[in-house]
From Swiss-Prot:
The active site is at residue 166. Mainly expressed in seeds. GO terms for molecular function: protein-cysteine S-palmitoyltransferase activity. InterPro entries: Palmitoyltrfase_DHHC (IPR001594), PFA4/ZDH16/20/ERF2-like (IPR039859). It is an enzyme of class 2 (transferase). It is found in: Cell membrane. Residues 300-407 are annotated as: Disordered. Its EC number is 2.3.1.225. Keywords: Acyltransferase, Cell membrane, Lipoprotein, Membrane, Palmitate, Transferase, Transmembrane, Transmembrane helix. The DHHC domain is required for palmitoyltransferase activity. This is Probable protein S-acyltransferase 9. It comes from the Eukaryota. Palmitoyl acyltransferase.
Amino acid sequence: MAGRVFEAWKGSNKFLFGGRLIFGPDAWSIPFTFLLIITPVCFFSVFVATHLRRELLPNNAGHVFLVAGVLFTVFVLILLFLTSARDPGIVPRNSHPPEEELCYDTTVSSDGRQTPTVQIPRTKEVMVYGVSVRVKYCDTCMLYRPPRCSHCSICNNCVERFDHHCPWRNYRYFFMFVSSATILCIYIFSMSALYIKVLMDNHQGTVWRAMRESPWAVMLMIYCFISLWFVGGLTGFHLYLISTNQTTYENFRYRSDNRINVYNRGCSNNFFETFCSKVKPSRNDFRAFIKEEPPRNITLATTWERPEEADEENREERRQKVEDDLDIDEDVMKLQQRLNDEEGSDTAHHKIDIDQMRIGSNERAPTIRSEARHGNWGARSNAQEEDVIAGSSVRESRSYAAAEEGR
């Protein structure tokens, strides 16, 4: 029985629940991220929100702070799970290079012979919004990458609209996650500061005295302040990228190459495209069974010959074979003329000539002029050579017998 696609996947992804969930090779960091989110919220619920509920008991506002913190934390964790377990837009790789893109290139070898080879252009031009954009060929996936697609060296896949590799792999949900995490940090920081303010008002003390009474609130404020620099800065940077319709990779590349961003269609349209456009279905069915490909008629090789060049080489070979046959016929005629001239000579001398001819014929047979130039004749050339040697031997035998009778 054929296996499923995720079982033979060539990328570095990790699959769970029979290919229903797909993670990156660094999926181990997801539980660690969960702990970084859940741990401060637990301390906030036990040491801040509970006491804040008691201090604000007459107004029943403390329950709202506790429930809001827990629900918002659950929302952030759901976003983290959605962004880390979904297909980020992996482009299916090909099993062989695209044949329609093959082109011939002539290379000159060390002996001076030109050999046509098959090559695939490294880049090609495509039109995007009326502007020509160059796309590259991926040797690993054996395809031309679509516009805004790059090959991720960590997960070993070509990913559409590749931004950067991190545990949160889908861009829309990734932005919602970091922005929600930013709001959660601000919320916990604000509630911890509010709790210290309530302690100051109720006990008529100073800030330092209130901080000593609730050290957990101070620790949460420090933790959220440090985290806010990371997730808050990341949220602000990606707000800029969304407003200009760029990815992190494109931002650095355009800045270094001074290239024009052809995808920028205005701030409002860019935000609409990011958050309101329909999410395309995945190109991969990881749970599907592997289908065996039919045998291909064309076999790709490192060296190819053009059809017209192959025909020209065959014609040259046939022409050379005809020339070899003509050379053999010429040698046969000369040998017959020599035998006819020697038949009218003296008997004694004729006998000596016949003996020499035997030796000469044995030496000449394998050293015909055409053999020196071409090591292999055809079946016709070999047959004619055997006829010449056999005919010369018969004539020599008859001449020798006639000479013996005359003596």
